[in-house]
Amino acid sequence: MARKPTPPGTPQPTSVGHIVDLVRGAVPPLHPAGLPFVLAPLGVAVLGRNRKWVRRGALTSAAACAAFFRHPHRVPPNRVGVAVAPADGEVALVDSAVPPSELDMGTEPLPRVSIFLSVLDVHVQRSPVGGEVTKVVHRSGQFLSADLADASEVNERNSMLLHTAEGHDVAVIQIAGLLARRIVCDAKVGDTLPIGDTYGLIRFGSRVDTYFPAGTTLLAERGQRTIGAETVIAQLP
């Protein structure tokens, strides 16, 4: 992301302040859910500072966790009626399927886009459309590999239903995986989410399914890489 130009007359920052500003602009912020995973190894590094292998191992672990829980700024497209990717990752499925029963969206298959997140991807989830949260349902289940077709049905999941201003219902499903054993969803019924707004996170590898209303044109392709909040994956009817 390009840095904003400095307006004329702006006081010049000190060398230390300038370095801090550059670091803030270059390093993505950390999602709050990742703080314990970063602080714990940092504490180990401090306690074991006299042992080089302990210090290095702990600092490496802290850096890896900070990278995993990064929360980069994103700019959604300013286009009417589009849906954006709810996560970074690779499109695993572009098809039609029956939405999770707990959302009461009926038994007819609806257009669906599934995105698989590897451990190297950004793992925050973002709202694919702007709308009001009308349902949030967590369901316990198994922890199969998230890239398997059955994962959407049998794995632990958190389902959220959004109702847009145009009257469309869009469902986003956070699905746990082989390593992802913790789903975080900060959205609550009654909340209004702007398109691209961060609402949750899945720890360490996962999958996100998005169900759209009938008549939606799916624009994503299997194998495509997506950028959460920015890649357009569908055009609503």
UniProtKB/Swiss-Prot annotation:
This is Phosphatidylserine decarboxylase proenzyme. The record marks G205, S206 as: Cleavage (non-hydrolytic). Its cofactor is pyruvate. Binds 1 pyruvoyl group covalently per subunit. InterPro entries: PS_Dcarbxylase, PSD-A. The active site is at S206 (schiff-base intermediate with substrate). It is a peripheral membrane protein. Heterodimer of a large membrane-associated beta subunit and a small pyruvoyl-containing alpha subunit. The gene is psd. Signal peptide: none annotated. Pathway: Phospholipid metabolism; phosphatidylethanolamine biosynthesis; phosphatidylethanolamine from CDP-diacylglycerol: step 2/2. The modification Pyruvic acid (Ser) is found at S206. Keywords: Cell membrane, Decarboxylase, Lipid biosynthesis, Lipid metabolism, Lyase, Membrane, Phospholipid biosynthesis, Phospholipid metabolism, Pyruvate, Zymogen.
